[in-house]
Amino acid sequence: MEAWDVVVLGDGPAALRAAAQAAQGGASTLMMSSTALGQPGLAALDGLSASIQESNPRSHREDTIRCGAFLSDQDIVADMTNSAVKQVDLLERRGLNYRRDLQGLPMVRRAIGHAQPRTSDAGSSTAVQVQQVGEEQAMRHGVVRRGDQVPLTLVHSNQSVDGLVVLDMVNGRVIGIQCKALIIADEGFEGAFGDGTVGLGMDLAFRAGVALRDMEFMTHHPLTIQGTNVMLPTGLLLDGAVVHEATGAELDSGTTPLDLARAIGQAVQPVLDARNLGEAAPWWGSLFRLVKQRTGIDMARQTVPLSPVVGHTIGGLPIDKHGRCVTSSWARWFTGLYAAGEASCSGFHGAAALPGNRLLDSLCTGAAAGTHAAEWTASQTFASTEGLTAAVDEAKADVSAMLQDNDATHVVRCGTLTASLHAALASTTSFSTSSLNNLLTKLEGLDHQAESLHVDQSSLFANTNLLEVFRTQAAIRMVMASVRSGLAREESRGSFVREDYPEASEEFLHHITVDQQGVVGQLALKKGTGGHWLLAPQ
């Protein structure tokens, strides 16, 4: 049985930063992804926001709090916005090729929702470059990286991490891995609403007893090509691209990302016109080629039809400023368990996210989790292997049962269940007590069906069918948690809108948590340092 100080789940910016920081701190570090290595995810889609040309980060901090409808933890917002310029500098010194202004500094533009120009990027190569920089740092510090490793069970003793059970699809076996600390830093659950990926790490901790926070909040990405899962960076709008209806009438994009997504969602045949980007066009060359390969649309000559989809789920594993997963209250920690990036809910975004803040959140939470995990594991010993050995045997039996030939005349496959999930979500066009309860009833039925999903492949080697079964089951559980959290929030705030409670209420100025049994709880909103509001709720 392998034993590592720190195991990191994921392969995006947060996971790479966490793994590199942990290894740099002296911890033996293993990084695992359920898919092939090298997939950057969506965190870097809209660049990185930092107050490079401002005397202080106060405006960035206040824009973030306002966009989050005052549901952000203000001490976290202060810490992350204060470190934003440092994050830009680190990426630049490690090789990221920003677009530059006449002074040679990273070029910043004013993205929607920001009061000042502060969002920088590298055009369509931003995500690839961020991924490359992260991989180079991980290799530099000796992180061991493995792909096609599917996490099955988080093994713990009284909410203290012992290790985890993993399906190794490279060697075709179920194995146990001992660890002192586990950092969950893979994807969120936005893939449940379309054709994207659902992270397994969040569900892993959820099944182990961790209550998820703020699951009702998610944002729609406005520039999604209709009928596909291709999301275009909103940075195109800063370079001269415009959104209008098919008739040519330009849309009023409003002042926030939510306004833009709603305007596009309500428009008649909305399209993106990126034919006149001028000198900025070369920065988007690889994106234009990708769109042409996927859709046949030449963005240099044609407009692109749009249809907003859920692109970012804000809720996730509740963490403190060190990246530790908290349970019930800020004072209780699921010992040895950390989270970062898309799988976590740091309190930075609140009820909606600003462009450029998503990558900032991933980098900051990844660094915090990796640094603290390395320091903490240095003084810890490994737990007993007894529970882990039993969990491996149980997982082997469960997987073997799933792979057995099913002689039943009627079987349920992932595609059918996923289509039913999407249909249930699409039919819920607005949120109210009745519509959310109806959706929850449908989801409970799907959750029951998901327990007996049919697996066509019988081998453990590269069994993508089995991986999709796990993802489908996780997606349904995550959406159920989101609906239960939405039922508990009897108000409209940020990206979450209810028909029967159209106004925000001070009574719900707190975080809502929900566990696997459906028990709803609360987590207090954190003010700034010293217990004072940095920006009082309005």
Predicted region positions:
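Conserved N-terminal glycine-rich FAD pyrophosphate-binding loop of Rossmann-like flavoproteins
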Residues: 33-65, 69, 223, 233
